[in-house]
Amino acid sequence: MSLSGIITALVTPFDRDGAFDRDAWIRLLDLQLAGGVQGVVIAGSTGEAATLTDAEYDEMLCSAVVRVGGRVPVLAGTGLSGTAKTISQTKRAADNGAGYALVVTPPYIRPNQGGLKAHYLAVADQGGLPVVLYNVPSRTGCDLLPETVADLAGHPNIVGIKEACASRERVQALLALRRPGFTVFSGDDSSAARSMLDGADGLVSVASNVLPSAYRHLCDLARAGERGAIDLWNARLSDFHAFCGLDSNPIPIKALLQRIGIGYGLRLPLLPLSVCHHDIADHLADQVAALEALSSRKIVAA
């Protein structure tokens, strides 16, 4: 199953006691499928993967694979600081039914480009899943450069990249270097429309947790080259883009989800959204239902 369009980087919903909330998880998956998303990421950084137990990881992934039922691709976050552990986690994801591994650059270690290349080649050779590279230097402390991506893209088991740098020049460099069959995804909601107009294949989104249809429509417009319409639609989503950047991900998006009845809170060391932002969270949550209804009508009409 190929990758393109809108993919949601899912949160992990917890209950009031901080335990994994399976019921809320299933409702979140159903919301995404009903909203027309074209893929889901399980246990990435938005999913607070670093706080999950192995048992929770297995339960989330297995239940998602069953619930999705082959309708859209399921990507599992498997990137860890060490190569051997990343390979092991990728094998674990494969055993649980994932279709792809989303592999972030090793956090905190800060390998050079040669080390990053060797790391990804080892995971691609030994992990048992097609690999989507994930570059987010603001969180990991290292930057996977386009020339290194170009070298890695020649491996048959390395099939794409989620690029979270908002730089237009970075995305254009990746597009210029990619081979056929290698997909380039924006990992930044606010600049994704521009990236897709330039030729990127889709968006791995945070805000689509609450607005799956709205971000599906965003991707559809951008990939169709509808520049006038995309500017207007992106402007409607701009407050959500800005809100999701008010604090560390996934603090803001989980505040919105809680307001629409999915999950409670985060796990330490993350704390809930500051009280000073509650009014804007309430205001945006009040807009979700109407915006999703409008988006659904536009998707059907298209």
From Swiss-Prot:
The keyword Nucleotide-binding does not apply. Pathway: Amino-acid biosynthesis; L-lysine biosynthesis via DAP pathway; (S)-tetrahydrodipicolinate from L-aspartate: step 3/4. Keywords: Amino-acid biosynthesis, Cytoplasm, Diaminopimelate biosynthesis, Lyase, Lysine biosynthesis, Schiff base. The record marks 45, 108 as: Part of a proton relay during catalysis. It is found in: Cytoplasm. It catalyses: L-aspartate 4-semialdehyde + pyruvate = (2S,4S)-4-hydroxy-2,3,4,5-tetrahydrodipicolinate + H2O + H(+). HAMAP family: DapA. Catalyzes the condensation of (S)-aspartate-beta-semialdehyde [(S)-ASA] and pyruvate to 4-hydroxy-tetrahydrodipicolinate (HTPA). This is 4-hydroxy-tetrahydrodipicolinate synthase. The lineage of its organism: Bacteria, Pseudomonadati, Pseudomonadota, Gammaproteobacteria, Lysobacterales.
